Amino acid sequence: MQRWKAAALASVLCSSVLSIWMCREGLLLSHRLGPALVPLHRLPRTLDARIARLAQYRALLQGAPDAMELRELTPWAGRPPGPRRRAGPRRRRARARLGARPCGLRELEVRVSELGLGYASDETVLFRYCAGACEAAARVYDLGLRRLRQRRRLRRERVRAQPCCRPTAYEDEVSFLDAHSRYHTVHELSARECACV
């Protein structure tokens, strides 16, 4: 029992000496380096987020040789904040068209049961599909059809006035095990090549 007490006392004493030594070294190091380790000063938060953002832009762009005008970066500077407008359908479509990638092959890792084919399986497969815009493949036919739809001349039939991004070739087969350990093979599940049709 005496040994354990002596070992505990020695351990406490050593750890105290070690922590005092580490603190002293840290203080000496920070004193030697001086203002190099001073933390960066963060701008105080203001009530108006726009003013804070302007101050940040000014600080970033100050002294830059090819800096653009601050007003070009912040078109809302200098005018009072107005009510937010909801984007209309035309605006949403235009924004969607700008960000749309061209027609091409995409892939997604999904569980077989998520495909809705009637198989209960927890296995995952790499599902390749076609997606993207086909505006470059639009023909005169598509332009004419779009105009007739806009003028509501084609009311009853559902017609697409633009080419669609569709698979032109499929993977031969995809195989997986279901929840009952039965082996299944599905043909032409995943796309291999895409084109605007």
From Swiss-Prot:
In its UniProt entry, the species of origin is given as Homo sapiens
- Signal sequence extent: 1-19
**Gene Ontology MF terms in the entry:** glial cell-derived neurotrophic factor receptor binding; growth factor activity; heparan sulfate binding; receptor tyrosine kinase binding; signaling receptor binding
Any one GO biological process? MAPK cascade
Gene that this polypeptide is encoded by: NRTN
Where would one find coiled-coil regions in this protein?
A: none
Name the segments for region: Disordered. Answer: 74-93
Say if the entry is tagged with keyword Signal: yes
| Disulphide-bridged cysteine pairs | 103-165, 130-194, 134-196
One Pfam family of this chain = TGF_beta
The protein, known as: Neurturin
What InterPro entries has UniProt attached to this entry? Cystine-knot_cytokine, GDNF_fam, TGF-b_C
Q: In its keyword annotation, does this UniProt entry include Secreted?
A: yes
Subcellular location(s) per record = Secreted
